Design a protein with these regions (language model features):
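FIC/Doc superfamily catalytic core
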Residues: 1-341
Length: 341
C-alpha cells in the first residue's frame, strides 16, 4: 500500500506554486512575508551577537524540522538533548532512531559562506516549472522546497531551506528561523493555494519570533554589560558573560573548567549573576546546579516573558562601552573560527 501511495503522489499532476492564480489577498500575504524576511535579515546582518542568536534560533528551527518528520519533540527537548541537561518535571524524549544526529552538521552549515549556485546543491535534477521566469524569488524558493519534499523523505529537506534562501539571494546568510515546511507538500493533501498561504504565514511568524529572540539577546548583552560596569570588583563576571553568549547553559563545573577557577568559586560567580537576573537556575532537585541565561529561559518557556513597558536601556558610560566592545571582540573571534570550520 505504501508503495502504491508513493507512486500515486509522484505521478499525480501537480500545479507548481509559481503557476498558481494570484489574488490581491495572496499578493498582500507575500509582501508581508518578504518584508518580515528582510527585517530579520537586516538586523542579523548588523548585529554583533549574530552567532549567539544562530545557536539559539537553531533549537527552534531543528525542533520544527523534527515535528515535520512526525517526532513529538519541542524546542526545550532539543535544547535538553544537545546540552545534556535534563529539564526538571519534563520526561525524557522517548523515540526511536537518532533524531538529533544531523543537528551538529546542520549548525555548521549555517555558517557556510561558499558561493555554490543553489542548483548545484539540489539532490535531484531540476527543471524550471510553469511560471518560473516571472515568479518572485521567495515563490521560486518555495517551489523548489515543494519539489524537493516529494523527492526526499528525510529531515534534510526542511533543514536545507535556510541555505537555499541564502543561495537564491533572499537572505545574506542562512537563517535557522527559515527551517520549515508542510507535511501536506509530500501527500498533496488540500488545495495548493492553502498550502502556499500556510507556508507564507509560517515564514512570517518565524521571522517575527526570530526578531523577538534577537531583541531579548541584545538586551541581555546590554544588561550584563551594565552589571559589570557597575561593579566595583567584577572579577570574572565579564568572562562569564562572554562564555554565556555561545554557551547559554552552564554549570559550576563547566565554568570552572572553561575559566580556570575552582568549582566553589564558579558556583559563587553563577549565583552572583543569578541574583542580578542574568541567569536562572534550572537544575531542580539535583546534586549539581545548572543555570541558563534569562533570555534563553524565556525562549524555552522556562521563564515567563516580562510584561508591560520594557525598562529604559542603561545610559552610556565609558565603562559600559568598554565592556560592550570586549563582548563584540569576543563574538568577532568566534565568527572567524566558525568561518574556518
Amino acid at each position: 500500500m505504501r508503495v502504491s501511495v508513493y507512486y500515486w503522489v509522484m505521478t499525480r499532476p501537480v500545479r507548481p506554486f509559481t503557476a498558481l492564480p494570484w489574488t490581491s489577498d495572496l499578493v498582500a500575504v507575500l509582501g508581508d512575508t518578504m518584508a518580515a524576511i528582510g527585517a530579520l535579515d537586516a538586523r542579523i546582518s548588523a548585529s554583533s551577537v549574530a552567532s549567539a542568536w544562530r545557536i539559539r534560533a537553531s533549537w527552534a528551527g531543528y525542533a520544527t524540522a523534527l515535528r515535520l518528520q512526525r517526532f513529538e519533540i519541542d524546542e526545550i527537548d532539543v535544547f535538553s538533548a544537545l546540552v545534556g541537561l535534563p529539564i526538571p518535571h519534563r520526561p525524557p524524549v522517548a523515540t526511536m532512531g537518532e533524531p538529533f544526529a544531523t543537528y551538529s552538521g546542520w549548525l555548521r552549515s549555517l555558517g557556510d559562506r561558499s558561493e555554490h549556485h543553489w542548483r548545484e546543491t539540489l539532490p535531484f535534477s531540476f527543471e524550471e516549472p510553469e511560471g518560473w521566469s516571472s515568479a518572485p524569488t521567495l515563490l521560486r524558493a518555495l517551489g523548489v522546497l515543494d519539489l524537493w519534499s516529494r523527492r526526499d523523505a528525510t529531515i534534510n529537506v526542511w533543514l536545507a531551506f535556510p541555505a537555499l534562501c541564502a543561495r537564491m539571494g533572499l537572505t545574506s546568510s542562512p537563517l535557522p528561523s527559515l527551517a520549515l515546511g508542510d507535511p501536506a507538500l509530500r501527500t498533496l493533501h488540500g488545495p495548493r493555494v492553502a498550502q502556499l498561504r500556510r507556508l507564507l504565514k509560517t515564514i512570517r511568524e518565524n521571522c517575527e519570533d526570530g526578531l523577538a529572540r534577537l531583541d531579548r539577546l541584545e538586551k541581555w548583552r546590554r544588561d550584563f554589560a551594565a552589571v559589570i560596569a557597575g561593579e566595583l570588583r567584577p572579577g570574572q563576571l565579564e568572562d562569564l558573560g562572554k562564555l554565556a553568549l555561545t554557551t547559554p547553559a552552564v554549570s559550576a563545573r563547566g565554568v570552572s573548567n572553561r575559566l580556570g577557577m575552582t568549582v566553589s568559586g564558579a558556583g559563587k560567580l553563577l549565583a552572583r549573576a543569578a541574583e542580578r537576573g542574568l541567569f536562572v537556575e534550572v537544575s531542580g532537585r539535583t546534586s549539581w546546579r545548572v543555570y541558563i541565561t534569562s533570555e534563553a529561559g524565556i525562549a524555552l518557556g522556562i521563564l515567563a516573558a516580562p510584561r508591560g513597558r520594557p525598562p529604559s536601556p542603561p545610559p552610556p558610560s565609558p565603562g559600559l562601552d568598554a565592556v560592550l566592545c570586549a563582548f563584540d571582540r569576543e563574538m568577532e573571534a568566534i565568527d572567524r573560527l566558525l568561518e574556518k570550520g
